C-alpha cells in the first residue's frame, strides 16, 4: 500500500506516485508497449478504482482485484490472477520501479523460459540479494547480505512460463494458510530449489531503481530518470 510514502499514497496506490512528470505505472506500461507487449494484467488492491480508470486509455489492460490485499502479500496477488492470466507465458513486474527498456528486452531475448532479472550490487537501498550456482540457477535470496553468497540484487522483473506458474500456484496452495504474507520472491526460491529451476539473468549496467520512499524518488529523478526517458 506504499505506507512509507506518507501523503503521496493517501489517494492513489504506490504505482501512481509520479517520477518526473509521470506516474511509475504509466512509465512501465509505455516501456512494455514499446517492447511489443500487447496484453497487460494488473493485480490490484488498495485504491483499485484508480487502476480501473487506466483501462479507459489503455484497452490492453485487464485488472484482477484481490479482496485480501491488506492481509496478504505479493505472492497471493500473483496467485489470485491465475484465472485471468490463463495459459499465457508472461513478464512479472512490480509497480514501484523505474527502468530502461533494456530490462524488458533482455528478458525477452533470454533463451530460458523462467528467469529472474538481477544486476550486480551497486545501490545502497534495502534489497533482495540473490545467489546462484555455476549454471545460473537461483539457489538463495535474502534481504540480509550475510545469509547469501551475493551475486547481485533483485530488480523486480521476471519472465515466467505458464507451465512454471501453474506449478508455482499449486505449490503455494499447500502453504497459503500458513504463510499468507509470503513474497513471491521466496516462492520462486522454493520452486527453484525443489521443483523447477529459475535461471538468473545478471545484466551489468542496467539502469533501474526501486522507489519505496521520498529519498528514493529524489535519487531516481536525479540519477536514473535521464536514462529512462
Language-model features, listed with the residues they occupy:
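A structural signal for short hydrophobic beta-strand segments in well-ordered beta-sheet cores
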Residues: 16, 130-132, 200
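Conserved core of the sugar-phosphate nucleotidyltransferase
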Residues: 100-175
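Short catalytic helix/loop segments, enriched in acidic residues and glycine
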Residues: 11-27
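Conserved N-terminal catalytic core of the sugar/cofactor nucleotidyltransferase
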Residues: 22-90, 178
